[in-house]
Curated annotation (Swiss-Prot):
Cysteine-cysteine disulfides: C151-C165
Residues bearing glycans: N53, N164
Pfam families reported in the protein's UniProt record: Neur_chan_LBD, Neur_chan_memb
Name of the protein this chain belongs to: Acetylcholine receptor subunit delta
Extracellular compartment segments: 22-247
Entry-annotated residues carrying Phosphotyrosine: Y394
Reactions listed under catalytic activity: K(+)(in) = K(+)(out); Na(+)(in) = Na(+)(out)
Record localization: Postsynaptic cell membrane; Cell membrane
Record family assignment: Belongs to the ligand-gated ion channel (TC 1.A.9) family. Acetylcholine receptor (TC 1.A.9.1) subfamily.
Organism: Xenopus laevis (African clawed frog)
Function recorded in the entry: After binding acetylcholine, the AChR responds by an extensive change in conformation that affects all subunits and leads to opening of an ion-conducting channel across the plasma membrane.
GO CC annotation, single: acetylcholine-gated channel complex
NCBIfam families: LIC
Amino acid sequence: MAWIWISLLLPILIYFPGCFSESEEERLLNHIFVERGYRKELRPVEHTGETVNVSLALTLSNLISLKEADETLTTNVWVELAWYDKRLAWDMETYNNIDILRVPPDMVWQPQLILENNNNGVFEVAYYSNVLISSDGFMYWLPPAIFQTSCSINVNYFPFDWQNCSLKFSSLTYNAKEINLQLRQDLDEASQRYYPVEWIIIDPEGFTENGEWEIVHIPAKKNIDRSLSPESTKYQDITFYLIIERKPLFYIINILAPCVLIALMANLVFYLPADSGEKMTLAISVLLAQSVFLLLISQRLPETSFAIPLISKYLMFIMVLVTIVVVSCVIVLNLHFRTPSTHAISERMKEIFLNKLPRILHMSQPAEPEPEPWSGVLLRRSSSVGYIVKAEEYYSVKSRSELMFEKQSERHGLTSRATPARVNPLNANNSQDQLYGEIKPAIDGANFIVKHIRDKNDYNEEKDNWYRIARTVDRLCLFLVTPVMIIGTLWIFLGGAYNLPPSLPFPGDPFIYTKEHRRLI
């Protein structure tokens, strides 16, 4: 019979051991939460007027991103909370020297701290880890969280900027008379004195560095608004500050360098000849390229009217300058294609644009042709003009018969007279008038040809002068635009390069909020 009872009780002993025995932790939990009648809705104080001290610390694991367009800072942190709840204390000897209990956070009282300046509607932590309870009633809670906080972006010096973001914690349930928010205090082993942890804790082994932002200052501070009553929930808060500086290399390579190179291409417009027809095409192409970059920058930054980013100032400066280049191209092309039949060049204009400015701008000038031996004839004329003049002189001293048979005599080998025939002056004058009347149509035709050639040369010379004026204006614009572009570029970007973060976290406060400069209590 005994073995029958054993076979019946053995499965029960295996599968239901709790029916016959209870662990020390279970007895302790039952004693604290059931027998004592623990109520998590009540503050852990013996008297109503007492204040619960809640210490807070923040450990930064990763600065994930800062989205300028949304003005949102995303961080991965560990929120460290600690307080005392004497209702949960116990005698370690009674419970087999158990010194720590781990319970879910919804079983105990919490100070209900929230992130005030969140930007996504999530006020609490992401994961509710267990709360550690010590035998003396000390409560320690270290939940992880990924916070998205609102961060006001100062775009003045983008991309050579620095930002001051913060994580502000407060309790919207309890006022300053009910809970006292304070920074965590650690013990200085050398002096055996406590000091507040007035900075964000960064574990070098667990911290992941951000590729765009560099952390400069990480102070932590308790803020008290003296203008409010301690009974207000906004009277006190603990704020952790992140002063970060942008690493501009990404923007220099991908935005600034292309912008500067494309802007310098605007100077090539002045080297293109006007006859090529590509001056306007190149200038407008540069203008459109800068417009595309300005559009890309506007999508990256917040829509604000309080400040203009540094890169936007530069792009606007270049766009205005390229617009001036386009206008100068229009003027140069207008001057280049002018003709004497539509426009006349004044003497003052010739003096300025053909003599003075070319010498100042060190422009090469065409060599002046040497004048011909006779006056009254155009410098650039046909050689036939000289023959006509010589013919008139020749006919005036030769008799008509000599003129008729001179060529035949030369053809048959006869020599002509060395001296001209002497004729009666009266007969000579009559003969000359008769000869002039016969050759007058030929002389008129020759004069017409000379006049036509002279007019054509004058026309071409005037047109060449317009070409030279257009070239002078083109060179003048080059000498004006290039220095303005270089000086403006250096002035804008050097102003951003000297925009350094502050040497101290708070203006007027000489304290450096680091562990090396901790303040002992």
